[in-house]
Structure formats: C-alpha cells, structure tokens
C-alpha cells in the first residue's frame, strides 16, 4: 500500500471514528459567540442594573424570636451561651440546678441551630424564586349569567326543554335582566379573513402596518361607540384604569368602518358595543354562544324597545328589543369550505357541517363511563389472553423475564365481539352503553368458554417448545388485523405538549407548516372515568391533516380499555394513538407510568400488544427517552418494538428521565436506536421462520431534542438518518420554526407579525373555548401560557451569529421598537397587558401565575414537563 493510500485510509478511519462518537453539534467559542450566551449585537444590549438597585430579600426571623438575645447572638460559640444578660458574674449553680441549666442551654443552642438552618433555607427559597416551578397553581373559573339558564341564553328556545314553560326550569329565562347586568361588550377590530388569504406578501405587510402600531396608542383609539356618550366612555376608562395598546382600530380599506351603527338609550342595551366584531360570527355567519357572547353587539339587530324601555309594548326576542342575526350567505360559504380532514359521509351527522372540530364523544358513552358500565368486550378477551399467556410463560421462567411475542390473534377479539353482540341480540338490545351491564352478565359463561378455547389453541405445545429452546411463545405467524401504515418521511412533527399544546396553538403551528400533530398527554384513568376535560384532549381541528392522541398509564388494565373506548367513541377521527414512555415528572413516574415503563419492558410489551389488538386498524406509536438514569437502555426496546410488538412508529427524545431538559440531547444514541430497529427488521425478514410472511418494512423513527433552527434540523437528519424530527420547545418559543425548516431560511419575523400571531391565537381560542366570559378568560390564561415561552425568542436581526441556539441565554436587551421590546418581556404582567389588546381588561378576581418562575432556558428545577 502506498503512503497516499495509507493516508487516505487513515483519514477515512478518523472520519468513521468521528461519526461513531458524534452526539450533538459542538459550537466552539469565537470572537462573536460564547457558548451559552446569545450573541446579541452591542447596540441592543442594555447596561446591567447597578447593584444598589437590586432588591435585598429580608430573612424572616419569626421562628427564632422565642430565643433569648444572648442565645441568638452566640449561635456559633457554644462556650459563651448563657441565660444571664446582666453585667454581674453568673451565679454558680450546683447539683440539679446546674444540670437543668445545661439542658436549657443545650435546648437553646439546638433551637438556634434550627432557626439558622430555617433562615438559610428561607434565603435559598427566596433565591429559588428566580427559577423552579410554581406548583399547585390555581385558576378561578369565572362565569357570568349566574342564576340564568345557560341553554336558553346560548341557543334560545332550542337550548332548554322547558322553554315553552319557563316556570318549570330551575333557572331564570329573563333575558332583559341578564342584558341589564351584563358587562360591556369587548372590542375586537374587524379582520378581513378571506382577503388576507388572497393577499400577496407586500399587501399583508401593508395591512399589518395599518393594523398595528410600533409605539403605544391611547385606549380610546380602539373603541369608539355611537351609543355611548363621551362622559360614559370617560367614566368607563376611569373605572377600568388607563390602558394603552399597539392595536389600531380598523382603518384598512379591506374592512371599512361601519356607518350604520344603531343608537339606543334603552337600559337593556347599554352593554352593547355595535362596532365590535365577534370572531365566531365573522367566519361562520352565526355565533354558537348566542346571548352570552362578549361581542354580542356584532350579531344582534335592534328591532325596538325592551320591557325596560317600554314596559307596555316590548319587542324582540324575550322582550329584549333585540334579535340574533344569522348571515345566511356567510353560513353557506362556511359550509362549502374545503377541509384538510373530514370523516366519511356515512359517519357525519347533520350538525357536522357547522363544526370545524371533530372527535366529540357521545353523551351516552360518557355517561356509561362515569357509571362504569361502558361495554368493553375486546378488552376483556385480550386481558384474559394476556393473563393466560403470562401464567404459561411463568411455568417456563418463574422470574418473568420472558415476554410474549407477536400480535394477539385476531380471532380472540372477533369471537369476543361476536359473543357480546349475540348476547345483546338475544335480548333484543343493541350494543349501547346503557345495556352493557346486562350484556356482560349474560356473556360471562361464553367468555369463560372463550378462555378455554384460547388455552386449547396450541399454546401448551408452544410452551413446551419454548422450554426446550429457552425462547418465548411465538405468535408472529398469527397475522394481525390490517393496520394503516404510517408513511412518515420528512414530515414535521409537533410534539404532544402538556398545557401549551392545546388546539388553538396547534392551529397556529398548522398555519406555519407543521404536518403531524399529537394532542396533549391524557391520563388513562381519567379517560376511563369519563372525565370531560380529559376527553376534550382528543378534539381535532379540521385543518390538522395528521392527528393522534397520547395516553399515559402504567398498567394494561388501564391502557387497553381506554384504547377500545377511544376506538368506539372517536373511531377514524384519530390517525394514530401514542403511548407516553418518556414523561419524567414524579407524579407520573411513581405510578409506574411515563418513563417508568422503560425499566419494565415485559409490562410495556403487554400494553403495546393489548392496545394493538383492540385498536383495530388504528396504528399505535410510542414515545421514549434514552433511559431513566445515566445508563442508556432504550436500544433494547427498539430491537423488539416492531418485530415483536408491531409498533407503527417510534420517537426517541435524546435525554434520560434524570436529565429532564438539562444538557444537550444525545443524537448519537438516537442514531444507534434507529439502526438497531432497522437491523432487527432485516434479521426478521431473513429468518426462515417467517419465510411465508410478507416482507416487513421498517417503521418511521423520529428523533427529538434541541431542534431550534433549520440548520439544526437538516444536520441531524443527515448525520442520524432518522425519518424525521419531532419539535417541542423550539415550536413553543418560535412557532414559525416550521416555515424556516420548509423554506430553509432564517426568518427575521417582525414584531407586527408576532402580535398578529397573538391575535390569531385569541380568535382561535374564542372559537374553541367560547366567546362568553368563561371562554374569554380561558383564552386569556392559555394565551399567557403561550407567551411564557414566546417571550424567550431573541429576534434574528439582533444576533451577531447564526443559527441561534436553544440553550443560549441572552443578556438584558431592547428590541428594535417598543412592541418588540414588550414581546421580549419576562414579566407576567406584561403578558396580561398583551392579552388586553384583544380580550379587554381581565376581571379583578382574575390572576395569572406563570408555571415557570423565570425565563431561564435550562435549569435543574425549571424543566418543562413535556414528555
């Protein structure tokens, strides 16, 4: 071999070695960049505050006030402690008195030591307020219409079955008294939604310039009402406090100001703002909240006087002098819209055309779950099969280290369904939840026979074979039901984000280009109890092209029935179901769920195989971490995830449970796990045991961790050869990251564009949670939750060095304009002020406590709790 060839070979070996040890990008220090510090240009950096301006936290000494001054003054010197503070020499004690005095001195010293430790702990606690989490946060539920019938106010006579006889209803149907006490309408400028979609980039920027100011404007700029006098407006502003905003009143040519605003001095109409815009009515042509809407003036018609204005001749609905408006042309246009996802026509109801959200559980199903009699025939059969299999495997291996392989036979599920259907048919009942208890009682004998049939299906022969080969039961030849394949290659996956990954936020990400969405993590036990809040997590917007939900649980007895209930209630509304095997929080881990499943692969095997059996053709995916501690163990799960468990896709977060979000994600280990899975599939295809089986195609493997720029995304794809990447914190801080990745550019997004994103979230939130008082304040709360992450974004135009890094913390800086500076504020009160620009002033009793006490990017105690 020549010297040149030897040199080339050495270089190749070095390159291969570098590939093997690569874990994550390493960016060394330069003249413009120091790792850990965002490289902001000098002209935008603000001087550090003087040390004298930093507030000094006083230590609470209440716990030590009971001690004598002498004991407090001599905490560190035990020899000088005494209870006598006079100038005279201490009296010499003898016998029992001296022993008693020594005990008192020792007790005083111990108390002083405890007080000192408590004071230090208090100082550390005050210190920790700069980081960590605000646990046990409480959010009050604020509602209006106390004592009034909510159904009647929302849907009129169709909303209350006692509408024809109001005296029979426990709640008041007096609409006039409700309007008289109702708070004044909120003001929201009109937005030309249809025209915005057709605008060019230049036209959109002009519209943003017309709609938002870069400097503060007076509050009177946004709300001018023809029906309110100047004195009333001044009194209202004085009562609410001075408010400033960056939102201009509608001055765009696309939405000309209304000149036909009605005028009324009727006391029942004093709360109406005729110039406001209801975001629901503006899009759909009708408002689902009816009279409860906080933007009521935009969709009512003045027809005359109310019973307060003219007691003898009241007009309008319920003597209110008003009528609700329905714009038929807008409704027809809404119903004829194109959707990214819709159910088959056979599964749509008549009201689905008016809904832009799917996956509503049935009222009968939720009621049956709360009563614990929801029919679960598949679950019962599958759990019996797994129990039988476990007992027989225990004969081979008493330690329980052998797990079952392959899918559960489809005949087990089919026979269970047939038995359940036959039991219901004999009694003349359908398989409705109401008759579930009777059906289960009558089918008990048949299920016992089914269990015996399963035991006689050749399992004993397989156990004998396993005993001689030290293997486990092989059911791989039993073909599962036909699953839908997940052809994910390069799709942008938005992670399931607890609290922040709500439907309005997912709609924001859809607009920026995300492809796959997974709903917030739901607890299996709460699903089984029919908890309405938990079942709302599976809600899907029609713009979400690929959508699944994530379940968290620690036992097959919990997760398998939830999977069957989801399939029965939601059906094709879910493209996949995901199992959370990565949640690091103690509350979940201590119950054996989340990342605790990583240490129990046998139990995880039962969960996956059982859920796969009851989900039918719905794919099942898993989300994992590298392990629970420093030792990385997840590659063992990847070796069997597809070949033995039939998982449809797998996502790996490159950190352990102990790391939470500390340190960099280990993408080298992600590559190792992806290769392990593909090698296991290759071995399965080459094995003669499965020669008559269809060739297995490797499932999609996604990586997760620290993706914050398009450069990060494509570098990891190239080095690890994963099928795609899941994006979590990067999307929370800058949701437009999906656009940057697809267009391969660094987007220096303007402050006006970011404020318009807040406007969209407000509209999406009001559409999702409702435009009544409760919905407005729920939207306000989750808007603040979103800003607790978006404020961490450092504008691209302020950086000396690109790309930006997720864990780089910026020094104190100012933006290029007042609005950009406000959007970067870490003060929660500033976030509330931003919500006021679209949702009005919050009630006095409303408050927001941020989940994270600081804007730190990576701390031990302030880690985000997304699995």
From Swiss-Prot:
<dbReference type="Pfam" id="PF01207">
    <property type="entry name" value="Dus"/>
</dbReference>
<dbReference type="GO" id="GO:0106414">
    <property type="term" value="F:mRNA dihydrouridine synthase activity"/>
</dbReference>
<dbReference type="GO" id="GO:0005634">
    <property type="term" value="C:nucleus"/>
</dbReference>
<feature type="compositionally biased region" description="Low complexity">
    <location>
        <begin position="225"/>
        <end position="240"/>
    </location>
</feature>
<keyword id="KW-0285">Flavoprotein</keyword>
<feature type="region of interest" description="Disordered">
    <location>
        <begin position="71"/>
        <end position="94"/>
    </location>
</feature>
<keyword id="KW-0963">Cytoplasm</keyword>
<feature type="zinc finger region" description="C3H1-type 2">
    <location>
        <begin position="278"/>
        <end position="299"/>
    </location>
</feature>
<dbReference type="GO" id="GO:0005737">
    <property type="term" value="C:cytoplasm"/>
</dbReference>
<feature type="zinc finger region" description="C3H1-type 1">
    <location>
        <begin position="149"/>
        <end position="173"/>
    </location>
</feature>
<dbReference type="GO" id="GO:0017150">
    <property type="term" value="F:tRNA dihydrouridine synthase activity"/>
</dbReference>
<protein>
    <recommendedName>
        <fullName>tRNA-dihydrouridine(47) synthase [NAD(P)(+)]</fullName>
        <ecNumber>1.3.1.89</ecNumber>
        <ecNumber>1.3.1.-</ecNumber>
    </recommendedName>
</protein>
<keyword id="KW-0507">mRNA processing</keyword>
<feature type="binding site">
    <location>
        <position position="653"/>
    </location>
    <ligand>
        <name>FMN</name>
    </ligand>
</feature>
<keyword id="KW-0863">Zinc-finger</keyword>
<dbReference type="GO" id="GO:0006397">
    <property type="term" value="P:mRNA processing"/>
</dbReference>
<feature type="compositionally biased region" description="Polar residues">
    <location>
        <begin position="855"/>
        <end position="867"/>
    </location>
</feature>
<keyword id="KW-0677">Repeat</keyword>
<dbReference type="GO" id="GO:0050660">
    <property type="term" value="F:flavin adenine dinucleotide binding"/>
</dbReference>
<keyword id="KW-0288">FMN</keyword>
<feature type="active site" description="Proton donor">
    <location>
        <position position="583"/>
    </location>
</feature>
<keyword id="KW-0479">Metal-binding</keyword>
<feature type="region of interest" description="Disordered">
    <location>
        <begin position="225"/>
        <end position="269"/>
    </location>
</feature>
<keyword id="KW-0862">Zinc</keyword>
<keyword id="KW-0819">tRNA processing</keyword>
<feature type="binding site">
    <location>
        <begin position="728"/>
        <end position="729"/>
    </location>
    <ligand>
        <name>FMN</name>
    </ligand>
</feature>
<dbReference type="InterPro" id="IPR035587">
    <property type="entry name" value="DUS-like_FMN-bd"/>
</dbReference>
<feature type="binding site">
    <location>
        <position position="550"/>
    </location>
    <ligand>
        <name>FMN</name>
    </ligand>
</feature>
<feature type="binding site">
    <location>
        <begin position="496"/>
        <end position="498"/>
    </location>
    <ligand>
        <name>FMN</name>
    </ligand>
</feature>
<feature type="region of interest" description="Disordered">
    <location>
        <begin position="842"/>
        <end position="867"/>
    </location>
</feature>
<dbReference type="GO" id="GO:0008270">
    <property type="term" value="F:zinc ion binding"/>
</dbReference>
<feature type="compositionally biased region" description="Polar residues">
    <location>
        <begin position="75"/>
        <end position="87"/>
    </location>
</feature>
<feature type="compositionally biased region" description="Low complexity">
    <location>
        <begin position="247"/>
        <end position="258"/>
    </location>
</feature>
<comment type="function">
    <text>Catalyzes the synthesis of dihydrouridine, a modified base found in the D-loop of most tRNAs. Specifically modifies U47 in cytoplasmic tRNAs. Catalyzes the synthesis of dihydrouridine in some mRNAs, thereby affecting their translation.</text>
</comment>
<dbReference type="InterPro" id="IPR018517">
    <property type="entry name" value="tRNA_hU_synthase_CS"/>
</dbReference>
<dbReference type="InterPro" id="IPR013785">
    <property type="entry name" value="Aldolase_TIM"/>
</dbReference>
<dbReference type="GO" id="GO:0102265">
    <property type="term" value="F:tRNA-dihydrouridine47 synthase activity"/>
</dbReference>
<keyword id="KW-0539">Nucleus</keyword>
<keyword id="KW-0520">NAD</keyword>
<keyword id="KW-0560">Oxidoreductase</keyword>
<keyword id="KW-0521">NADP</keyword>
<feature type="binding site">
    <location>
        <position position="623"/>
    </location>
    <ligand>
        <name>FMN</name>
    </ligand>
</feature>
